[in-house]
Amino acid sequence: MVKGIFPALGLAIAVTLAGGPAFAGAGDPVKGEKVFKKCKACHSAKPGKHKVGPSLAGVFGRKAGTAEGYKKYRGLKGADYTWDEALLDEYLTNPKNFVKKRGAKGTSMGFRLKKDAQRADVIAYLKTLK
């Protein structure tokens, strides 16, 4: 029984130190800015300039559903989490499932980024927006 514990413990430590499976890793903000062009139909990178969706300036580290001046939140209104790499990665993978999993009403965002590298790059870019 003890022999089986050490490999499992080693695997758990390795996954933890590697950042876990939830986030693909460090992205390239320059590439992310290019991928973000797909997002610009609905989102702005300028503070306070909202479109169909909220401005994404300052989104990293901000409590979800709280972009100042944006009033159209559905699924993220009243959220109790703050955007970090893992949550942004999960959200961008499938926004509708993300909000449903958290018991929210839904989201009008149907766009998703299917490629891990693109999500990592966009997240790296979002981190540069203040």
Task: Give the label of every model feature segment.
Residues 1-10:
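Bacterial N-terminal signal peptides that target proteins for export
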Residues 19-36:
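Electrostatic cytochrome c docking/interface patches
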Residues 32, 36-45, 122:
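The canonical Cys-X-X-Cys-His
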Residues 51-57:
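Short cysteine/histidine-rich zinc-coordinating motifs and their immediately flanking basic loops
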Residues 54, 68-118:
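Axial heme c-ligation environment in periplasmic c-type cytochrome domains
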